[in-house]
Swiss-Prot record:
Organism, scientific name: Pelotomaculum thermopropionicum (strain DSM 13744 / JCM 10971 / SI)
GO MF term list: rRNA binding; structural constituent of ribosome; transferase activity
NCBIfam families: rplB_bact
UniProt-listed GO biological process terms: cytoplasmic translation
Biased composition (Basic residues): 257-274
Keyword Transcription regulation: no
UniProt region (Disordered), positions on chain: 224-274
A UniProt-annotated Pfam family: Ribosomal_L2
Subunit structure: Part of the 50S ribosomal subunit. Forms a bridge to the 30S subunit in the 70S ribosome.
Keywords on record: Ribonucleoprotein, Ribosomal protein, RNA-binding, rRNA-binding
The gene coding this protein: rplB
Biological role: One of the primary rRNA binding proteins. Required for association of the 30S and 50S subunits to form the 70S ribosome, for tRNA binding and peptide bond formation. It has been suggested to have peptidyltransferase activity; this is somewhat controversial. Makes several contacts with the 16S rRNA in the 70S ribosome.
Name recorded for this polypeptide: Large ribosomal subunit protein uL2
Length: 274
């Protein structure tokens, strides 16, 4: 993948960069693996905004992705590499030997025509999925399960990869992309390799309208609001906040820790660097 730049023929064109999509081999998704995706506009079932700055954006179809990779021992041929509007990574369409079709997250280096397989006896090759106990120490992995048979939850974004650092007892020690060191059960599965579309982090949005295409609305600073709308609001002209910075709901902002305590915290060996 490469990044494409444009001549500055207009202010909106000047800073825009896009992917050249050279790895994409098919433009229409597999019909049997898509379903409708209704936009929520950031609202919950009561109709209240639970996520701000959401709304609009281009229509999308949801591609059903196989995060479990539980079809053991049956080889699958990579039929195509496709764009997925619902994630930063590319997806790969697999044609299994028994006729079934599934989408997976496309790892870096996976090409049309290659064969991938899941299961404890799979080779250590990009795109193959194995339990952590069968993966050599030092291997780069992605799409990692938090619990056995729970489906991949960790390390699924474009260009992301974790590393298997050690195995001890029933746990494997994983270094996450953030630098956090975490223990996971060795029965959990992971896919070999790094997630593809590595250059995604270097793309510049370039203009406000492109954010709107993605369904992201403007973010307004609290200090320019009225007092009824935000704790930072009000005052004559440009005025200071007048208190320690807080969220719209009055909780400490800018540096205050917000992570809740969870039972899984005991499996974190080393926190990420702040």
């Amino acid at each position: 993948m490469a990044i494409k730049k444009f001549k500055p023929t207009s202010p909106g064109r000047r800073f825009v960069t896009v992917s050249d999509f050279e790895e994409i081999t098919r433009t229409e998704p597999e019909k049997s693996l898509v379903e409708p995706l209704k936009k929520s506009g950031g609202r919950n079932a009561q109709g209240r905004i639970t996520v701000r700055h959401r709304g609009g954006g281009h229509k999308r179809l949801y591609r059903i992705i196989d995060f479990k990779r539980d079809k053991d021992g049956i080889p699958a041929k990579v039929a195509s590499i496709e764009y997925d509007p619902n994630r930063s990574a590319r997806i790969a369409l697999l044609h299994y030997a028994d006729g079934e079709k599934r989408y997976i997250i496309a790892p870096a280096g996976l090409e049309v025509g290659q064969t991938v397989v899941s299961g404890p006896d799979a080779d250590i090759k990009a795109g193959n999925c194995l339990p952590l106990k069968n993966i050599p120490v030092g291997t780069m992995i992605h799409n990692i399960e938090l619990y056995p048979n729970g489906g991949g939850k960790l390390v699924r974004s474009a260009g992301a990869s974790a590393q298997l650092m050690a195995k001890e007892g029933k746990y494997a020690n994983i270094r996450m992309p953030s630098g956090e060191m975490r223990l996971l059960l060795q029965e959990c599965r992971a896919t070999i390799g790094q997630v593809g579309n590595v250059e995604h982090e270097n793309i510049t949005i370039g203009k406000a309208g492109r954010k709107r295409w993605l369904g992201i609305r403007p973010t307004v600073r609290g200090v320019v609001m009225n007092p009824v709308d935000h704790p930072h609001g009000g005052g004559e002209g440009r005025s200071p906040i007048g208190r320690n910075p807080v969220t719209p709901w009055g909780k400490p902002a800018l540096g205050a820790r917000t992570r809740k305590k969870k039972p899984g915290d005991r499996l974190i060996v080393k926190r990420r660097a702040r």
